Amino acid sequence: MAIILEHRSDLTLEACRRVAWGGEAVTLGPQARDSIAKARRDFLALIDREDITIYGVNTGYGHQAKRRLIPDERMAQAKAPTHHRAASWGDPLPERVLRAIVFARLANVIEGHAALSPHVAEAVAAMLEQGPLPSVPARGQGGAGEILSLSYLFLPLTQRVELAEKDMLSLINGSPAAAALVADAALAARERLDLVADVFALAAEAFNAPLGHFAPELESLWNNPNDAWALEALRIRIGTGHGGARRPYQAPVSIRIMPRIMGEAHRAMYAADTIARQSLAAVSDNPVVFPAGERIGQDEVVSTGGYHNAQAPAAMDALTAAVTNLAVIASRVAAKLQDGPVSLLPPFLGYPEGRDYLGCLAMAMVGYEEEMRMLAQPTLLPGSESGGFAQDDVASPVFLAWSKQEKASELLELALASLAPIALRAFEVTGRPVPEALRSLAAETRQHFPDDGEVSALGPRCAALAAHFRANIYKA
């Protein structure tokens, strides 16, 4: 059943997940339709007034903003195709992200702030039930705002519906892509953290780490709700442990700081979640129309910088840094589990060479980790004006930030898929039972690393397990 949208408050992160990941459609409710129609009527009464300048409606675009248009020029501009703005190229965004962008596009529309023609608004909503969306490149998004990407996404729609003043501008202006990208990152981060907790708990118990490292008393002492989440997450999964003798002294730093590093990742996830919720329901249009009941001053239409979401890239950068640090912990623990004098386990978990040797998995993890370090560089404002000329002189870096966190997250999944079989091997060589809460993970890992004597490369097995992890993360 389609989600009914009446107000901006209906554009929640939960609804975005249903639409973007679950493939659900949306319908504009009667209140939304009334608001859109009234706003359009009021807007059309404004555009002929000589005392009001409306960017891109009775003026030209970009460097032509100072030029006033006569009515015939206005309509010609409104109907002009946007092919020339679809100028970037490269790897396409996933379908789930495209659906999230269309969903977020409705925030400007639903209460009339975009003054979009009602039939165009209905056409935007209908895109979510008409099959695959137009392909949009993730690369080359170096323009001010999001006009390069949104031109790709809405170009077919503009070719099949009648456009009037401001309609084209309302489709390609604002920052719905930023809202969608940070929403996608936040949703995935929450699911991925559960996977991290599973694999880290499996590794900590495989190491036979003292349970006191995750003691509940630490929650109040550390005085941090995110660290408290991590401590509890590890305790829930490990439970009372295997019931035998525990390691008599402290585990290495990489295990003792697990909850701290997980806690920081949880903080980054929560921050991205908050910004996603704010952004999905935010009005970001330029120019933006103030319905009569919202006006504080005399202005009825104003130009804004709403198309530049500065918080979304910062939030995604924090996620990239967090998953990079998690990968560092994973690679250190993978190595320590195989280091007998440190782990108190059989050296190399009983297989110092030959087909059952797992030491090279830890080497591969260092490679993932180093690539992630490159991706974790801060995403700053672009340093040159380039094609912006007189007006559009600062680009939005939001696509860069999303692409980096997306790739870094995939690399973390590979690191976790490398650590899990090493941890499982430790249980097997010691005969200790896997905690009940982690038996599903153990079974999934064993499915991709069967103990059947078959000789095969480890890399493809890790890739298959990582792909399984990823499918679960993005499950609707």
Specify the residue positions occupied by each region the protein language model found.
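Acidic, glycine-rich active-site loops and adjacent beta-strand->loop/helix elements
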Residues: Y61, A107-N108, L128, G140-G142, ...
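FAD-binding core of FAD-dependent oxidoreductases
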Residues: Y55-A80, H84-V109, S135-L157, A164-A180, ...
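Residues that scaffold, gate, or flank divalent-cation-dependent active/transport sites
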Residues: D10-L44, D48-V57, Y61-R99, A121
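Short, surface-exposed, polar/charged, turn-prone segments marking secondary-structure boundaries
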Residues: T82-R85, Q130, D198-V199, M365
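Short secondary-structure transition/capping motifs
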Residues: L28, A32, K66, I70, ...
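FAD-binding glycine-rich core of flavoenzymes that anchor FAD
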Residues: H113-P137
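Generic beta-strand or strand-like secondary-structure segments
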Residues: A80, A100, A123-A126, A318, ...
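C-terminal auxiliary extensions adjacent to catalytic cores
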Residues: A2-E24, L28-E50, S135, S149-S151, ...
